[in-house]
Amino acid sequence: MAVEIEGRITNINPEEVKAKLLAIGAKPLGFYNFRRYVFDPAIGAPHRWLRLRTDGNKTTLTFKELSNDSFSGTEEWEIEVSDFETTLEILEKTGIKHRSYQENTRDEYEYHGAKISIDHWPKLGYLLEIEVEKEEDIYDITSKLGFNPQDIVSANHADLYQNIGIDVNSCDVLKF
């Protein structure tokens, strides 16, 4: 199990942020087109979910549990699986039905051990996601990119969608 420590900045200009990342020495890791199925593992557990995700090359199965809304409020357990479609079929044959299908893109960078992503989500637009080992690194990196501390949110994607009037937990398909 790992605790995710991540912060987000919404409504960014992806080209400006990419230029700033390169200017501070961030290393490009790749551009990904993600497809995912999200499952509810238990009735009455809205803050727990299972995610099957692929970028076409790497496929992972991840269980996530949100304990609070802080930067470090999500725990995750993740394994790599070899076949996206077969894993989906196995999960559904056990009776676990997916609640939604989702797509997003990610332009990912590494900077002094931090994973920094420019994500694009349908109807949500572009956002910056920074995953670090220590919470204070979120503030350090965003400052170097020209953002203010009040620009940073710890909200998860479901909350960000809720802020624009979309209940992502009731949305069967979320794609471009």
Residue ranges and their predicted role:
Residues K115-W121:
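Strongly charged, low-complexity linkers/loops
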Residues M1-G113, N148-F176:
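N-terminal strand-loop-strand beta-hairpin
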Residues I138-Q150:
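Long, well-ordered alpha-helical scaffolding segments within enzyme catalytic domains
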Residues T10, E133-E135:
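Short amphipathic alpha-helical "recognition" segments used for binding
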Residues W121-K123, E133:
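Secondary-structure transition motif
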